Curated annotation (Swiss-Prot):
This is Calcineurin B-like protein 1. The lineage of its organism: Eukaryota, Viridiplantae, Streptophyta, Embryophyta, Tracheophyta. It comes from Arabidopsis thaliana (Mouse-ear cress). Calcium binding of CBL1 is not required for membrane association and the endoplasmic reticulum-to-plasma membrane trafficking relies on a brefeldin A-insensitive pathway. Lipid modification is not required for interaction between CBL1 and CIPK1. S-acylated at Cys-3 by either palmitate or stearate. Myristoylation is a prerequisite for the subsequent acylation. Myristoylation is important for endoplasmic reticulum targeting and subsequent acylation at the endoplasmic reticulum enables further trafficking to the plasma membrane. Phosphorylated by CIPK23 and CIPK24. A lipid is attached at residue 3 (S-palmitoyl cysteine). The gene is CBL1.
């Protein structure tokens, strides 16, 4: 194990230990190691400083650094846990953890609630849902008439806004998602597909596993 720790210490210098991150998330050590390779690739795409800025994040998601997108901005802001305008490796892994198949339903519901609550008011309001819906439709290259979008919004708030105060609180959102689990399809990160399939099934061979065998 000494050889691994010596090499790992050099490889991950300045970043959180993969074994520690694996113990705090649903990822295995091998998966964290693969995520580190991914992190290095993204964080050096514009400025090689060991951190992911918004431009690099945008480039990784949409292969374009010029395209402004509400969805990408919201995901970046939620990954930027320390609110420094950049994402370090620890935050990258912990943020991706919510998209892991073994992540709890409660965590996924909480993430999607915060994703839609763009103004951080503790409520999801109609305009926020509309903005996100339009952004997602744009990314999937789908077009809906304004009337259709308004019908979707009407139906959403009719079903989710139980107390009819014009906004959806955390409990209402949780109940709504539990009745409509398809809403969590966003948690498969379809718009991060190019990132998450860079290393299919995390095929990198872990040095920890190698030592263990």
């Amino acid at each position: 194990m000494g050889c691994f720790h010596s090499k790992a210490a050099k490889e991950f210098r300045g970043h959180e230990d993969p074994v520690k991150l694996a113990s705090e998330t649903a990822f295995s050590v091998s998966e964290v190691e693969a995520l580190f390779e991914l992190f290095k690739s993204i964080s050096s795409s514009v400025v090689d400083d060991g951190l992911i800025n918004k431009e690099e994040f945008q480039l990784a998601l949409f292969k374009s650094r010029k395209r402004e997108n509400i969805f990408a901005n919201r995901i970046f802001d939620m990954f930027d846990v320390k609110r420094k305008g950049v994402i370090d490796f620890g935050d990258f892994v912990r943020s991706l953890n919510v998209f892991h198949p073994n992540a709890s339903l409660e965590d996924k519901i909480d993430f999607t609630f915060r994703l839609y609550d763009m103004d951080c008011t503790g409520y999801i309001e109609r305009q926020e849902v509309k903005q996100m819906l339009i952004a997602l439709l744009c990314e999937s290259e789908m077009k809906l008439a304004d009337e259709t979008i308004e019908i979707i919004l009407d139906k959403t708030f009719e079903d989710a806004d139980v107390n009819q105060d014009g906004k959806i609180d955390k409990l209402e959102w949780s109940d709504f998602v539990n009745k409509n689990p398809s809403l969590l399809k966003i948690m498969t990160l379809p718009y991060l597909r190019d990132i998450t399939t860079t290393f299919p099934s995390f095929v990198f061979h872990s040095e920890v596993d190698e030592i263990a065998t």
